[in-house]
Amino acid sequence: MIKNAFISFQEQKEESRGSVEFQVFIFTNKIRRLTSHLELHRKDYLSQRGLRKILGKRQRLLAYLSKKNRVRYKELINQLNIRELKTR
């Protein structure tokens, strides 16, 4: 599974599972899982609300990472195959 591979990679890199990259990775997995669920169950409004909350959390973490370390941010979005944040 991708999660186990990423966890082992993160453990080699640093012992902290609370890193921004790891949190974004977990949120991305949850988002993908909820998206596939909502394709089948379109009227599941509680899941839609949960998806919006997780999207907001991931967006805030990515904004923080892009401000603090642009190189790590670019590597992460390429690794997870997600789009770059829109800037205002």
Curated annotation (Swiss-Prot):
It is found in: Plastid, Chloroplast. GO terms for cellular component: chloroplast; ribonucleoprotein complex; ribosome. The keyword NADP does not apply. Disulfide bonds: none annotated. It holds the Pfam family Ribosomal_S15. Belongs to the universal ribosomal protein uS15 family. This is Small ribosomal subunit protein uS15c.
